[in-house]
Amino acid sequence: MTKTEFAGFIREHGPVILDGATGTNLMEAGMPIGVCPESWVLENPQVLLDLQRRYVEAGSHIVYASTFTGNRIKLEEYGLQERLEEINTQLVALSRQAVGDQALVAGDMTMTGQQLFPMGELLFEELVDVYKEQASVLAKAGVDLFVVETMMSLQECRAAVIAIREVCDLPIMVTLTYNEDGRTLFGTPPELSLIHISEPTRPY
């Protein structure tokens, strides 16, 4: 799907309805705390199939593939980093099976859980590569678009958007988490976030 096609999709459907609180619903369906969500879903595929079918029945136009923490850094916490391609590919296929042609499937990406230098040890270029690896697999798996969601760090958000744009030209949705003062955890207001995310560039 091109950006122009996505814009047409939005115009055609009016308010576009996304899916629901998948993590919460998975835990209510029996997913234990502390397990790798991506792996658990693949071991219990019917749970996600039923959930996402209910989303579509309720009116969702876009569902998120259950690839939320499917990046190398997060998967490494469970010793699953070498299965990154397999896990992400199968999860996209599972969502596609659930919704058919009744909804779009978004490749879902989020934070790695590590801080960027100088607050942490992870370099910006390394983070772009981490996201680029996942984005490449998701694009190859056939997602219709990407969502970079629940981000608290503008820099990490920029890295994800840069990575996706270097891999493909699919549409990208971005969501950040804001505190009651209207700023992210790192103090960034929405207006500044929009400026930096709209045209992100590598800091050469």
List each model region and its residues:
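Conserved, mostly hydrophobic/aromatic
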Residues: 20, 55, 95, 138, ...
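Single conserved hydrophobic/aromatic residue that forms the stacking wall/gate
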Residues: 195-204
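N-terminal small/glycine-rich loop or linker at the start of catalytic domains
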Residues: 6-43, 68-75, 101-126, 170-183
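Catalytic beta/alpha-barrel core
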Residues: 127, 144-153, 185, 198
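Alpha-helix-loop-beta-strand connector modules within alpha/beta enzyme cores
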Residues: 77-103, 158-175
